[in-house]
């Protein structure tokens, strides 16, 4: 599933993007480590060994995102939620190359939370502005700024149209 389709299905029209709301609109359940621990009788230590931040899995045939609600800061939790959403929509929960899946999920999260075609049309000029606008970490914002300045990215008209009112108000 393409990011533009997720934005459309979740009616996402502005930044910052709420990845958990998008997941819910796609029928993907998001639960805390506390709930996972209680439902599956798994200790927090076992969950932390799996991942300090979060992970995704299939419950039957339904994708679930498990998030450590006490991990780090809000921006890191948002990126983790978007990363796990990526695993769900990119089909990674059915197996495959783990290293490749992690790279793809990281790329998905960056593209999903900070769409370059929207940032370009908003005329952003600094990593700090991207971080504030998209609710991402300073390091993630710096990477997005470098990618934006390179000019080598897909300018998706569907996404630009979806965010048109937001872009117009941003100026």
Mark where each language-model region is.
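Active-site hotspot residues in diverse enzymes, especially metal/ion-binding acidic/histidine motifs
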Residues: 1-171
């Amino acid at each position: 599933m393409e990011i533009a389709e997720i934005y459309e299905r979740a009616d996402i029209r502005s930044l910052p993007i709420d990845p958990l709301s998008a997941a819910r609109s796609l029928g993907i359940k998001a639960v805390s480590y506390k709930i996972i621990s209680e439902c599956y009788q798994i200790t927090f230590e076992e969950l932390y060994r799996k991942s300090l931040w979060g992970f995704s899995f299939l419950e039957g045939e339904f994708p679930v995102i498990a998030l450590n609600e006490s991990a780090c800061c809000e921006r890191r939790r948002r990126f983790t939620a978007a990363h796990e959403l990526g695993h769900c929509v990119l089909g990674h929960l059915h197996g495959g190359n783990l290293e490749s899946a992690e790279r793809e999920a990281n790329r998905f999260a960056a593209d999903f939370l900070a769409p370059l075609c929207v940032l370009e049309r908003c005329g952003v000029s600094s990593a700090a502005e991207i971080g504030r606008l998209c609710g991402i970490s300073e390091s993630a914002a710096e990477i997005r700024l470098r990618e934006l300045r390179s000019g080598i990215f897909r300018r998706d008209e569907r996404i630009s149209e979806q965010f048109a009112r937001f872009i117009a108000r941003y100026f």
